[in-house]
Amino acid sequence: IQYAIPGVGERLLARRRLVTPPGQLVAETLALCSPHPERIPPGMVEAAIALIGARADALGVDRAYLQAARSLLRFAAGRGRYYGLMRALPMPVLMLHGEADRLVPVQSARAAAARCPHWMFETFPEVGHIPMMEIPEVVDDRIATWTKLNF
């Protein structure tokens, strides 16, 4: 919640970036996002470290992170409106969700899918918030199948 507070979140992220090496930032983030960060392909980890080390626009990255944190609070405050917007989406939707996601509980994903039965929805055991990094071959297969069915 502290990251969602305007001004506080920006300062916290700036301080963290100053005192934490890129490799540690990536390791901590992956440990938060995945129950099995060791399964993430080493090339993806190396690319993430290089990106953090080379990024010139940290404000843009921080802004995206803070917007996500703040949107969770807005969602919690206005679920009915949010679900209505989801149901109104005119295009096909594929939602893949890790059952071990610590950031967005699988119960929330299941609730969204129940309200939108026209969506294609699948969960994966022992997968967290980043299935595209944790099980990239499976995600690639699901996207390919979904694309063939919908386009």
Task: State each model region's role.
Residues 1-16:
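Flexible "cap/lid" loop of the alpha/beta hydrolase fold
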Residues 45, 81-83, 105-114:
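Short alpha-helix in the alpha/beta-hydrolase fold that links the catalytic acid
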Residues 75-76, 100-104:
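Acidic catalytic loop of the alpha/beta-hydrolase fold
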